[in-house]
């Protein structure tokens, strides 16, 4: 029984030392109590992530956007669609009107070289 308890203690000690060695190899000592040679930055990664998300999503920082009137936005969107359709119709109608105006105001000219016209 004494042999079994001794081997169990040595086995646990070996397991603990191997895990400590593996953690220190990965860059973070297992048994350190927080007093490190190089102290951590002011904000840890766990603190930086929510702060970054809040900064990138300005809706959380500005409570004035919380009461946006949704029906007015829908009406603005409808007006913009109508304006876009009107613009596209006007844009497609412009070249045909321009060609009609050019043909009526200027007679067709023949190609001439010096005094010989074709």
UniProtKB/Swiss-Prot annotation:
Record family assignment: Belongs to the urotensin-2 family.
Keyword terms of this UniProt record: Cleavage on pair of basic residues, Disulfide bond, Hormone, Secreted, Signal
Maturation-removed propeptide residues: 28-108
Protein name, per record: Urotensin-2B
Signal peptide feature range: 1-27
Top-level division of the source organism's lineage: Eukaryota
Species assigned in the record: Rattus norvegicus
Keyword Disulfide bond set for record: yes
Transmembrane segments: none
Localization in the cell: Secreted
GO biological process: blood vessel diameter maintenance; regulation of blood pressure
PROSITE patterns: UROTENSIN_II
GO molecular function: G protein-coupled receptor binding; hormone activity
Cellular component per GO, a single term: extracellular region
């Amino acid at each position: 029984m004494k042999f079994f308890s001794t081997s169990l203690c040595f086995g646990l000690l070996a397991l603990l030392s191997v895990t400590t060695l593996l953690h220190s190899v990965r860059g973070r000592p297992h048994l350190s109590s927080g007093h490190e040679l190089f102290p951590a930055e002011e904000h840890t990664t766990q603190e930086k992530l929510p702060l970054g998300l809040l900064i990138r999503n300005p809706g959380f920082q500005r409570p004035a956007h919380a009461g946006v009137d949704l029906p007015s936005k829908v009406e603005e969107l409808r007006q913009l669609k109508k304006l876009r359709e009107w613009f596209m119709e006007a844009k497609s109608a412009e070249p045909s009107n321009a060609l009609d105006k050019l043909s009526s105001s200027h007679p067709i000219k023949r190609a001439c070289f010096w005094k010989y016209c074709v």
